[in-house]
């Protein structure tokens, strides 16, 4: 039967527990720092590692706009207006006046985009129009009114 003392027990009373000089087995200082320490701009002690494995570690990238400045532009396409015209008439968003159908998009959108076609001459009221949308509305015999 083999009887072997544990290393910890053997080294009781030893200053360094087998690590040589006292300062050799201290904290992060003997290991080049902890984690990403030393990867910064100053002494570049881990510069080659930074360049190879973390090239984006330094430097600024973009910015985030403050929430009070951000504003989502709600859009609607000509295609969706044309397809849902009956529904818009029922809800009262669109109405007929002097033989023309007037669609007031300000209730549900900020800008009208020119995707799709218009089959009827419509008068569309909106806060903004894309250039293509204006062209298509006029080509169909309608009118684009800025509110």
UniProtKB/Swiss-Prot annotation:
Q: What is this protein called?
A: Large ribosomal subunit protein uL15
Q: Its function?
A: Binds to the 23S rRNA.
- Identify the SUPFAM superfamilies for this entry: Ribosomal proteins L15p and L18e
Which residues does the annotated region (Disordered) include?
1-43
Origin organism is: Pyrococcus abyssi (strain GE5 / Orsay)
Which family does the record assign? Belongs to the universal ribosomal protein uL15 family.
GO BP annotations of the record are: translation
* A Pfam family of this chain: Ribosomal_L27A
Q: Where is the composition biased (Basic residues)?
A: 1-28
């Amino acid at each position: 039967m083999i009887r072997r003392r544990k290393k910890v027990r053997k080294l009781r009373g030893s200053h360094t527990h087998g690590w040589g000089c006292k300062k050799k087995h201290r904290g992060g200082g003997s290991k080049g720092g902890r984690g990403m320490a030393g990867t910064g701009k100053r002494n570049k002690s881990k510069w080659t590692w930074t360049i190879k494995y973390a090239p984006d570690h330094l430097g600024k990238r973009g910015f985030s706009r403050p929430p009070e400045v951000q504003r989502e532009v709600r859009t609607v396409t000509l295609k969706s207006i044309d397809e849902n015209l009956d529904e818009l008439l029922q809800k009262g968003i669109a109405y007929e006046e002097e033989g023309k159908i007037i669609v007031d998009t300000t209730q549900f959108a900020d800008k009208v985009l020119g995707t799709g076609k218009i089959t009827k001459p419509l008068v569309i009221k909106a806060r903004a129009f894309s250039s293509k949308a204006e062209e298509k509305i006029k080509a169909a015999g309608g009118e684009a009114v800025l509110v």
